[in-house]
Amino acid sequence: MKILVTGGAGFIGSNFVYYELDNYPNDEVICLDKLTYAGNLETLEVAMKNPKFKFVKGDIADRAFVDELFASEKPDVVVNFAAESHVDRSIENPEIFLQTNIIGTSVLMDACRKYGNIRYHQVSTDEVYGDLPLDRPDLFFTETTPLHTSSPYSASKASADLLVQAYYRTYKLPVTISRCSNNYGPYHFPEKLIPLMIANALNDKKLPVYGKGENVRDWLYVEDHCSAIDLIIRKGKIGEVYNIGGHNERTNLEVVKTIIKELDKSEDLIEFVTDRPGHDRRYAIDPTKIHNELGWLPATKFDDGIKKTIDWYLTHKSWWEKIISGEYKDYYDKMYKNR
């Protein structure tokens, strides 16, 4: 099988590339990535040595380019990780989110239709459901929860999901959608909570926490997410949505304190900053459907996953130090320095 992985130089996409190459040595993996700030070719350094892997630089919203790629490579499956994904950035500049997350999705699906009704999987997010109240721990997102977005980012992803479902109903394109909870693990770009806190703590820098740190997220180790997506593209029911959750709910403050404890740092590093607009209170996914239909369950407990993640950052300092010393530093200062 030949799999086209878009956004494969990013965090989850690169982990999925390695998952496929490791578990299916006879399959071919093509990585298409625009190499924006969150894409990093160094992440794919090991994959580049594999004869079954090919990297292509390009934009999923470039219709002519995508058309040419499909004509030459003829993939059997497309897994779309390519997305602008940071909520704060979407508040600063929504336009690029609409272009990549919505237009890019339509361009990919049009190519799938044109070149043989190719199997298409959309990687989405639990943020399309909005949020849940902190005082109702009995509530969870299911696949039938109405879409109720809170940011330009989540609105763009929800729009893409609706477009995918429309292509299934209108054109009979063989599609599936997965909606995951917050991921963590190797190769995570250090603008997101866990890698940001690890990098800052290692450098004895302040750990900026929005509001009082009471917002709750369900954490999913990235390898578990990859195994779920692999199951869906190989055994999932066409036209269906699958929620992928980690059964690991934590407040943001609990996550930060766990990292501090593992690194033997002081809680004095914690600095509470002004909350962002429309900050969702709680995300919690019910993954019953994917468990019942495909037999999937998350294998990694949060405490184990966070230790593995910290160990990875300790042994790959050159990878993330290059990132935080570049363009990201200006963005970081803008977002946190004066809040």
Indicate where each model-derived feature is located.
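Residues that form or flank phosphate/diphosphate-binding pockets in enzymes
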Residues: 12, 38-39, 64, 188, ...
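Hydrophobic alpha-helix immediately C-terminal to the catalytic Tyr-X-X-X-Lys motif of short-chain
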Residues: 159, 163, 167, 197, ...
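Residue-level recognition of oxygen-bearing side chains
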Residues: 65, 96, 103, 189-193, ...
